[in-house]
């Protein structure tokens, strides 16, 4: 009887670990920003279970070792599950992904930071020390630099092959891949995410998502970088 007990305890612990990991990875698909932007948490247990979390700083899913219990919902069994839950978080410049630093130890000033969860700029009181570059002098500067450029609404419509029986090559914008792809159009019905040629699709939907290549950085950021360069020289 005593020899059976350790086996049951082992099976029970494995069941609990599997349940915890399963629950953590069952996030619904879509823009789950509150879940995906949580920091990675391997939990207090000591198992080493290969899992995946969404990294706000690289804006991609990365592997980590889950301890097997507790932790948080930013925890997925597979890379595919992580991508499925978090792919809709739009890409923004690196400094806009940083968490705001509200420590106050110097001259107080009102500034704005980009909130990756809400994709908006919010006001905060900057203390002037240990701050990062996610801070802007006003809301307009913040939004102009950080807010993702949006394509027309119909670019986000799903692929629709239509209602008839023809077989015509058309192109649609795939928001998940952020690229234009070919599909077979049946000749009638469908939606506006339907282009006769690849060039029109790219011009309408892809270019609208890209930020200007030579976009100037806000003066505040340039000033901070010049100051850092001067300090290194002395």
UniProtKB/Swiss-Prot annotation:
Keywords: Blood coagulation, Disulfide bond, Glycoprotein, Hemostasis, Protease inhibitor, Repeat, Secreted, Serine protease inhibitor, Signal
SS bond partners: 36-86, 45-69, 61-82, 96-146, 105-129, 121-142, 155-205, 164-188, 180-201
Subcellular location: Secreted
Main localization category: secreted
Subunit structure: Finds in a complex with ABCB1, TFPI2 and PPP2R3C; leading to the dephosphorylation of ABCB1.
Domain remark in the UniProt entry: This inhibitor contains three inhibitory domains.
The protein's role, per its UniProt record: May play a role in the regulation of plasmin-mediated matrix remodeling. Inhibits trypsin, plasmin, factor VIIa/tissue factor and weakly factor Xa. Has no effect on thrombin.
Protein name (Swiss-Prot/TrEMBL): Tissue factor pathway inhibitor 2
Source organism of the structure: Bos taurus (Bovine)
Lineage: Eukaryota, Metazoa, Chordata, Craniata, Vertebrata
Gene encoding the protein: TFPI2
